């Protein structure tokens, strides 16, 4: 399915763990790494496409993750000319337009399975620091990755603040019940990522 401008509608998926690292996947038979992504089928809405791709590419079901955020706008990248296929029987696809989702893995990482499809997209994966993919992805996707990660960084910062607030609340409640204990000093949580200072 290609739109009138030549872009294929697509979903992209960033999966994080509780330490703020993100899942980085190696494309099958290649020395190329990226986030899971895939096209939207006719009749699917964006969220349905995301959960289908999530299972097909990394073997995770809806129950294995928590949806933290979905980007509100389409982000586009053009393919290099060498990758554009000029097939007379089909419209020419010049690139992808993507909606991105931020998910947190709530299941054990053993649930990740790259072999759920007969034609696997990936043959390896690992956890990497939050900003690592922006520097390492192929150049024509870099601007999209930078925009996505800047948006998602704000979401994860908010999640960390919630965790810190809940810990402080629990400490205060415990101290109130047992007055011989003092409230634990507030500790600054170690940030799982650094602020990217590259070009916008």
Swiss-Prot record:
* Annotated segments matching region Disordered: 161-188
- The Enzyme Commission number assigned here is 3.6.1.-
Going by the entry's taxonomy, the superkingdom of the source organism is recorded as: Bacteria
Name the PROSITE patterns on file: NUDIX, NUDIX_BOX
* GO cellular component term, pick one: cytoplasm
Chain ranges of the Nudix hydrolase domain:
6-150
Q: Which cofactor does it need?
A: a divalent metal cation
- Motif (Nudix box) positions are 38-59
Mind listing the UniProt keywords for this protein, alphabetically?
Hydrolase
Q: Which GO terms describe its molecular function?
A: mRNA 5'-diphosphatase activity
Q: Which GO terms describe its biological process?
A: mRNA catabolic process
Tell me the protein family, please.
Belongs to the Nudix hydrolase family. RppH subfamily.
Chain's role: Accelerates the degradation of transcripts by removing pyrophosphate from the 5'-end of triphosphorylated RNA, leading to a more labile monophosphorylated state that can stimulate subsequent ribonuclease cleavage.
Protein name stated in the entry: RNA pyrophosphohydrolase
């Amino acid at each position: 399915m290609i739109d009138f401008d030549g872009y294929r509608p697509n979903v992209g998926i960033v999966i994080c763990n509780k330490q703020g690292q993100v899942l980085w996947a190696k494309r099958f038979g290649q020395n190329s790494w990226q986030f899971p992504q895939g096209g939207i089928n006719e009749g699917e809405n964006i969220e349905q496409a995301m959960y289908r791709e999530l299972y097909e590419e990394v073997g995770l079901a809806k129950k294995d993750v928590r949806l933290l955020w979905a980007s509100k706008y389409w982000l586009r990248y053009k393919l290099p000319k060498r990758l554009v296929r000029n097939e007379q029987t089909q419209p020419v696809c010049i690139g992808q337009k993507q909606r991105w989702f931020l998910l947190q893995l709530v299941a054990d990482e053993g649930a990740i399975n790259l072999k759920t499809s007969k034609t696997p997209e990936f043959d390896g994966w690992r956890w990497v620091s939050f900003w690592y993919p922006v520097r390492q992805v192929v150049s024509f996707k870099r601007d999209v990755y930078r925009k996505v990660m800047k948006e998602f960084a704000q979401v994860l910062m908010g999640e960390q603040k919630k965790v810190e607030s809940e810990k402080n609340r629990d400490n205060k409640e415990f101290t109130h019940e047992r007055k011989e204990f003092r409230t634990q000093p507030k500790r600054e949580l170690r940030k799982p990522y650094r602020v990217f200072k590259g070009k916008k």
